C-alpha cells in the first residue's frame, strides 16, 4: 500500500535510511538575528517543496539523484537561547560529520553556518570555507550580538583563515577595512578558474556556504536582505560547476537566507533546490 503514497515534506528522492546515507539533509528554521526582513525560518521547507518540480537528472553532470544515497531529517528541533540553539546545531553537525557523511543544510539565516563550521573544526584541523554572498558578514558585532547573521564570517575567520568570499558587494567600512588589512580573499566577482586552481592547490577539506542573496534580486527576490547589482542564476551555476574539480574535498554545504514570504512564483526556492540538486550530484 505504501508505494502508492509520496512524502512531499522531504527533499525529492530522499528515501535512504540514515544509517546507509552518504549525505544527510536537514534544515534549521532559525532567523532571530535577521537585520531587515524575517522569514528565512521557512526556507528549508520551501526548498523541499520546490525540489519536486525538478528532474532528478542533471544533463550537465550526467548524474541522477536516483543513483545517490541520502536522507532528509527535516527540521532541527530548536529551543532555548541562541547559545543553546547553536549548541544543538553544533552537536548534530559534528555527529553527522564524525560518521563520514556529507552534510547538506537548508537555512534559516546565515548565522547558522557558524556552529556548523565549529563542528567542522572539531573534525578537521585545517579546512577551507567558500562563501557565495552579497555581503561581507565580517562585522564583529551587530546590535550588540556577536552571533548575528551580519557577523557569521567574522566568527568563521576566527576558526580558519582559509576563507574565500565571492560575489561580495555590500558591507560597512569596518568590514572592508578588515578585509584589506588582513588581505582576505574577498572578491566582488564570482569564483573563476584561477580562483579554483588556487583553492585546489591548498589540498584541504572544503565547506561551501551559499547565501541566496548573492543573486541579483531579479533572480532571487525571496530573501530578507536583497542587494542589487548581483549575479544571474546562470552566472552562479557556471561558477558552482567549477567545484566539480574539488568535489572529493567537499565535506558539505549550506544554502541560507531563502525567505519564501517575499518570493515571486517560487523562483528563489526553485533556484535553491536546483543548487542543492547539482551540488549533491557533484559530491555524493
Swiss-Prot record:
Keywords attached to this entry: Hydrolase, Iron, Metal-binding, Putrescine biosynthesis
Effect of residue 151 to S: 5% of wild-type activity in the presence of DTT
Reported effect, residue 136 to A: 89% of wild-type activity in the presence of DTT
Enzyme class: hydrolase
EC number(s) stated in the UniProt entry for this protein: 3.5.3.11
Cofactor binding annotation: Binds 2 Fe(2+) ions per subunit. Can also use Mn(2+), with lower efficiency.
Biological processes, Gene Ontology terms: putrescine biosynthetic process from arginine, via agmatine
Binding-site residues, Fe cation 2: 133, 135, 151, 211, 213
Cofactors demanded by this protein: Fe(2+)
Protein family (similarity comment): Belongs to the arginase family. Agmatinase subfamily.
Protein name: Agmatinase
Species per Swiss-Prot/TrEMBL record: Methanocaldococcus jannaschii (strain ATCC 43067 / DSM 2661 / JAL-1 / JCM 10045 / NBRC 100440)
Lineage: Archaea, Methanobacteriati, Methanobacteriota, Methanomada group, Methanococci
Gene: speB
Amino acid at each position: 500500500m505504501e508505494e502508492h503514497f509520496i512524502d512531499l515534506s522531504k527533499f525529492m528522492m530522499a528515501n535512504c535510511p540514515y544509517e546507509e546515507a552518504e549525505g544527510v539533509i536537514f534544515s534549521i528554521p532559525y532567523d532571530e538575528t535577521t537585520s531587515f526582513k524575517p522569514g528565512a525560518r521557512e526556507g528549508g521547507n520551501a526548498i523541499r517543496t520546490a525540489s519536486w518540480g525538478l528532474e532528478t537528472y542533471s544533463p550537465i553532470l550526467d548524474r541522477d539523484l536516483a543513483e545517490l544515497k541520502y536522507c532528509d531529517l527535516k527540521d532541527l528541533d530548536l529551543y532555548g537561547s541562541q547559545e543553546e540553539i547553536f549548541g544543538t546545531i553544533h552537536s548534530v553537525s559534528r555527529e553527522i560529520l564524525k560518521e563520514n557523511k556529507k552534510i547538506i543544510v537548508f537555512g534559516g539565516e546565515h548565522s547558522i553556518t557558524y556552529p556548523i563550521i565549529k563542528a567542522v573544526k572539531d573534525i578537521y584541523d585545517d579546512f577551507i570555507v567558500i562563501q557565495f554572498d552579497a555581503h561581507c558578514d565580517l562585522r564583529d558585532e551587530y546590535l550588540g550580538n556577536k552571533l548575528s547573521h551580519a557577523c557569521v564570517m567574522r566568527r568563521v575567520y576566527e576558526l580558519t583563515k582559509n576563507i574565500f568570499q565571492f560575489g561580495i558587494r555590500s558591507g560597512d567600512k569596518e568590514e572592508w577595512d578588515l578585509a584589506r588589512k588582513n588581505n582576505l580573499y574577498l572578491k566582488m566577482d564570482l569564483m573563476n578558474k584561477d580562483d579554483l586552481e588556487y583553492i585546489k592547490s591548498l589540498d584541504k577539506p572544503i565547506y561551501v556556504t551559499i547565501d541566496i542573496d548573492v543573486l541579483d534580486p531579479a533572480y532571487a527576490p525571496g530573501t530578507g536582505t536583497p542587494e542589487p547589482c548581483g549575479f544571474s542564476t546562470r552566472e552562479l551555476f557556471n561558477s558552482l560547476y567549477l567545484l566539480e574539480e574539488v568535489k572529493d574535498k567537499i565535506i558539505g554545504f549550506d544554502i541560507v537566507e531563502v525567505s519564501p514570504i517575499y518570493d515571486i512564483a517560487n523562483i528563489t526556492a526553485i533556484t535553491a533546490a536546483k543548487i542543492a540538486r547539482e551540488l549533491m550530484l557533484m559530491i555524493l
